[in-house]
Amino acid sequence: MFNLLTLAAVLSTSMVFTTPASAAVSSVSAASEQVCHFAPVADSAASLQHTQSLGVIYSENTVSNLQYLNNYHSVALRSGQNGALDSRIRNAFISSSDPKLAIDWLVGSLKKEFASVTVYDSLDALMQARPDVVVMLDTYNRLVSKRNSQVEARFMARFYDTNLQYIGKAEGEVVREMTSVWVQGKAAPEIAAQIDQQRDLQVNALKQFDASLKALVMQADRAQVAAN
């Protein structure tokens, strides 16, 4: 029977092979790997402006993180087969491991601040498109499992000029140690509420990112006004 302890064991196994910080992602293309290794040799004199076009690419860590979330999410979806797991617990696992939550939020936040935002599959494709600013999105999540009770959400956007020189960054980060959800005797609503905290934590980190992004753009606005 696929109960909570079975789910814990499966999630723990999934964590071993897909932890974002160390996973080897076979699906990463050579072009995707290429973007993960470029590094600015100096800070850029360019500034951010609302009228700019942004070309976005995912870091290697983000590609790995998305695989981790997809694996975790798939386990959560399968956990409801034959009604073996309380629906409230299952739904909490599904909601808190949504692979699209952070990426959609981050891209949406960029779209609110800049004229256009396009996500590219490779650095080559991005550079050929010649956007005004290059953005590398870096994401990291760590969710609860039988072996882990520390939940982490770290999101960062690094901005570069057309020569890949560093302009600045926006970021948000929340880390929290959670009480174990695997203790026998806990009621389903209590377990579901604990698991839901994973999503709340991610949202809090994303809100931090939004505030950081606004501050970065506002700083550029003020610098431009002072220069005129």
Label each PLM-derived region with a short phrase:
Residues 1-5:
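Positively charged n-region of N-terminal signal peptides that target proteins for export
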Residues 6-16:
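Bacterial N-terminal signal peptides
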Residues 16-20, 110, 117-123, 213-228:
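An exposure/low-complexity boundary signal
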Residues 19-103, 217-228:
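A structural "domain/chain start" motif
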Residues 23-49, 163-228:
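C-terminal/domain-edge helix-coil "capping" segments
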Residues 26-36, 122-169:
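Surface-exposed short loop/turn segments
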Residues 62-63, 140-145, 174-180:
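Solvent-exposed loop/turn segments at secondary-structure junctions
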Residues 91-140:
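Short, solvent-exposed, polar/charged sequence segments at loop or secondary-structure edges
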